Amino acid sequence: MTPMRKSNPILKMINRSFIDLPAPPNLSMWWNFGSLLAACLILQIITGLLLAMHYSPDTSSAFSSIAHITRDVKYGWITRYLHANGASMLFICLFLHIGRGLYYGSYLLLETWNIGIMLLLMTMTTAFMGYVLPWGQMSFWGATVITNLLSAIPYIGTNLVQWIWGGYAIDSPTLTRFFTLHFILPFIIIALTTVHLLFLHETGSNNPCGISSDSDKIAFHPYYTTKDILGLVLLLFILATLTLLSPNLLNDPDNYIPADPLNTPPHIKPEWYFLFAYTILRSIPNKLGGVLALFLSILILAAIPMLHKSKQQSMMFRPLSQFLFWLLITILLTLTWIGSEPVVQPLTTIGQVASMMYFITILILMPLASLIENNLLKWT
């Protein structure tokens, strides 16, 4: 008799995607982050829905509604901190997922990679809007600085900013539309994630060696489901530890001060996961140039498949490329550190050098290293 998972139309889809899915036999723990991202997304939607039931998207009551959630709502404090720290965990998993894609050459699965970039942009947009909602000092000034960047667009910039604001300054209409978009975007992210998986299952997963595994596959369940559950337990342990022992470790103290348009904080900065892009923005003295560099720092990921010059897909057997990959990680960590600091010397110069090195490493050094490695292969 045919098992129900193979005959029922709905269960059949789940079976093909998560149970009988043929998978390479040598996937490492780096392949866990896709399922962890799904877990983080589900957690964010559940906690977000619970918070939305008590939140008031109006400048006069937004800050107090957050205080009300934290103090008066049953388990409101843990819901709020799970949501805030869950976003940090989501971005950690996201960056590691992208890093794995770069290291093992998964970007050569073009459709999957490009939808992944769209997911990254959408997640960053959602997170930025979520940062504005508590209506603290950093929420208000962060929103002012970031939305003002659009005024650098020639001709339509000023009108575009006023259209986003819903007036001549950030006020209740801005907060209402940000809340609406912050609520709806995660559901669009789920739809895009489904398309991401659809394209991935069309080609099959890449593997650490970067070679075809068509001749040797294993079932996804129970091997990789067990592995994913272990990753999920570790993720939940880290999230629970962070939320229960140090919930404000990754938050900004200025956001516990109600938004005041007449009082600018000494150092305006976004959440930690945007700091690398924020440093690149700050490194260029020209406003339009800074905005272009900011967008290019993310969109450069779309150019990586075109910059792949190696005869091998994975970096596993390419020491020069490995060195440049870890150099790139060091540059990104440096950019994150500089973004969290005020604009003073010598930090500004370090930020400018790191920003320049970020683009040079990806656009010039990595393709060059691949060509050198191709020539070295001829001598072996």
From Swiss-Prot:
Presence of keyword rRNA-binding: no
One GO molecular-function entry: metal ion binding
Residue positions binding heme b b562: 83, 182
Gene Ontology biological process terms, A to Z: mitochondrial electron transport, ubiquinol to cytochrome c
Cofactor dependence: heme b
Main localization, broad class: mitochondrion
Alphabetic keyword roster: Electron transport, Heme, Iron, Membrane, Metal-binding, Mitochondrion, Mitochondrion inner membrane, Respiratory chain, Transmembrane, Transmembrane helix, Transport, Ubiquinone
Co-factor note (free text): Binds 2 heme b groups non-covalently.
Residues reported in the UniProt entry to bind a ubiquinone: 201
Topological type in the membrane: Multi-pass membrane protein
Record-linked Gene3D superfamilies: Cytochrome Bc1 Complex, Chain C
Membrane-spanning parts: 33-53, 77-98, 113-133, 178-198, 226-246, 288-308, 320-340, 347-367
GO cellular component, one term: respiratory chain complex III
Subcellular compartments: Mitochondrion inner membrane
Chain positions recorded as heme b b566 binding sites: 97, 196
UniProt similarity note: Belongs to the cytochrome b family.
Subunit (UniProt): The cytochrome bc1 complex contains 11 subunits: 3 respiratory subunits (MT-CYB, CYC1 and UQCRFS1), 2 core proteins (UQCRC1 and UQCRC2) and 6 low-molecular weight proteins (UQCRH/QCR6, UQCRB/QCR7, UQCRQ/QCR8, UQCR10/QCR9, UQCR11/QCR10 and a cleavage product of UQCRFS1). This cytochrome bc1 complex then forms a dimer.
Function: Component of the ubiquinol-cytochrome c reductase complex (complex III or cytochrome b-c1 complex) that is part of the mitochondrial respiratory chain. The b-c1 complex mediates electron transfer from ubiquinol to cytochrome c. Contributes to the generation of a proton gradient across the mitochondrial membrane that is then used for ATP synthesis.
Further remarks about this protein from its record: Heme 1 (or BL or b562) is low-potential and absorbs at about 562 nm, and heme 2 (or BH or b566) is high-potential and absorbs at about 566 nm.
Protein name in the entry: Cytochrome b
